[in-house]
Amino acid sequence: GNVFSKIFPILYLLGFLFLILAMVDFLSGKEEMKIQQKVNSVIFVLDVSNSMNAEDVAPYRLQQAKNILKNCLQQMHDDKVGIVVFAGEAQSIMPLTSDYTAAETYIDAIETNVVRRQGTDFLKAVEVAADKFKKIPKGSRKIVLISDGEDNEGNEKAAIKEAKNQGIIINSIGVGTDEGAPIPVYVYGQLMGYKTAMNDETVITKRQTEALMSLAYDTGGEYLDGNN
C-alpha cells in the first residue's frame, strides 16, 4: 500500500499534465483552424490594353500598376495569389500560389502585347478569375483589379452579377489621370508615334473611374486611386 500511496500522486499529476497538454493541443488546433480560415485567395486582374502605355503617370500606367501589385505582395503573408491579364479578352498567366517571388517575376514580365485583342472587357476578366477560384471557398475569393477603366465594353453590370454569383469581392484601383495623355504606338519596342483617330487627331486617353467604382462597391469591395 505504501508504494501505491507514493505512486498515486505522481500518476495523478501525470494525468493532470496530460489533460492540460491535451487542452492546449485542442485549443491551438482550434487556433490553427481559425488562422487557416483567414487565408484569402487573391487574383490580381491587370488591364493590359494599349491605353495602359500612356505616360500621364510616371513612368507609364502599366508600370505604375505593376508597382502597386508588387507593393500588395509585400503586405501578404499566407494568402494565395494568382494573375489574370485582360484587354478585349482575358487569360490566366499564373495559377494560385503562395510563391510570392514567382509572382513578382510574372508581374515584371507583363507587357501590353500579351493580349492581342484590344478593349477593356471586365466580364471576361471576372469569368477567367472565377474559373481559377473553383476550388476556393466563397468567403475567401478576392480580386484586385487595376485598370484605367477606359474603352470598356459597357458590360461591367454583367461582370458585377458574375462576381456576386461566384462570391467574389472586387477591390479596384484606377490608374491614369483625368487630364489624360496620348497613347504611344510601339513597333518591336520602338516608339513610332501616337495613336490617332480617323480624322488624324491624336487620341487622348483619360482615366474613367465610374465602372471601376461600381465593380468595387457593388461587390462589397473598395475603390482606390492609384495615384495616392
Protein language model features and the residues they cover:
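Juxtamembrane amphipathic/hinge helix adjacent to a transmembrane helix
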Residues: 218, 222-228
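VWA/integrin I-like adhesion module and closely mimicked acidic/polar interface patches used
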Residues: 116-120, 142, 149-214, 218
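Membrane-embedded segments
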Residues: 25-141, 155-158
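Short glycine-/polar-rich loops that comprise or flank the Walker A/P-loop
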Residues: 40, 78, 166-169, 219-221
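Hydrophobic/aromatic beta-strand patches that form the interior of the parallel beta-sheet core
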Residues: 43, 84, 144, 171-173, ...
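Residue-level signature of catalytic and energy-coupling elements of molecular machines
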Residues: 19, 103, 129, 170, ...
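Active-site metal-binding loops of divalent metal-dependent hydrolases
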Residues: 48, 148-149
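Juxtamembrane linker/hinge segments adjacent to transmembrane helices in membrane proteins
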Residues: 1-21
